[in-house]
Amino acid sequence: MIGKTITNFSPLTEGILLKRYKRFLADVELDTGEVVTAHCANTGPMKGVLHVGGRVRLRHSPSPSRKLSWSWEQAQVPSGQSFSWVGVNTALPNKLVRLAIEAGCLKQELGEIFEIKNEVTYGVARKSRIDLLLTPHFNNSDSRKIFVEIKNTTWAKGSTAVFPDTVTTRGQKHLQEMINEVPSSRAVLVPCISRNDIEVFVPGDSADAKYGDLFRLALNAGVEVIPCAFDFHLDCITWEGTKPFLKGENF
């Protein structure tokens, strides 16, 4: 299924990133010469992805209910002797992973799925939300519910994808909650690798040492890790398969 189209959309508009500011805003000079302000859904540091003067792709969605009609969707980054397009819209990973499951791309890893629910409340205090809750088909040998936590992964060191790119107390909490779900349920961490130049995934110990420690603790407790890669094009996003992972940057 490598190369399978997961979602299609109207062709994006290309331009040059002039600046990103106030976390949510980015000024872009379109190839027509027009300068526009786009919404940036990614409020993090965007390590290794934010390149002033680099090429970007925007979605144009004019609407009276929107303050900004442009949204920053993709960024072009150096990759070896070439370039790679990276998805920077943090609202997409959950949708992409769900679509990949529905398309059967993860049948080998997850089995046949009967039902998928989004944003389900769970956890010891019932104050957390799992990205996806899967109910296996009755034919599956493993009938346990599957809790799926998805992490948008854009930072890369060479051909290695790394998450997180900064300290994430929220991510730490999610790992702790997932540990509590096994073995009565399956808990699966899915790094959603939003670029096509990756060979392996590692937790970002250099950015968040505690997250790295919890990642390894979760592995030992039975939490599964399934890194999923996608390729971002001008008018579609395709499935690039699952990737192997290492236990840490120094392992």
Curated annotation (Swiss-Prot):
Q: Which InterPro entries match?
A: SfsA (IPR005224), SfsA_C (IPR040452), SfsA_N (IPR041465)
Q: Which PANTHER family match?
A: SUGAR FERMENTATION STIMULATION PROTEIN A
Gene responsible for this protein: sfsA
Query: What is an example of a Pfam family matching this protein?
Result: SfsA_N
In terms of HAMAP family, this protein maps to:
SfsA (MF_00095)
- In terms of domain of life, where is this protein from? Bacteria
Protein name as it appears in the record? Sugar fermentation stimulation protein homolog
For this UniProt entry, the molecular function terms from Gene Ontology, in alphabetical order, are: DNA binding
Say which family it is in: Belongs to the SfsA family.
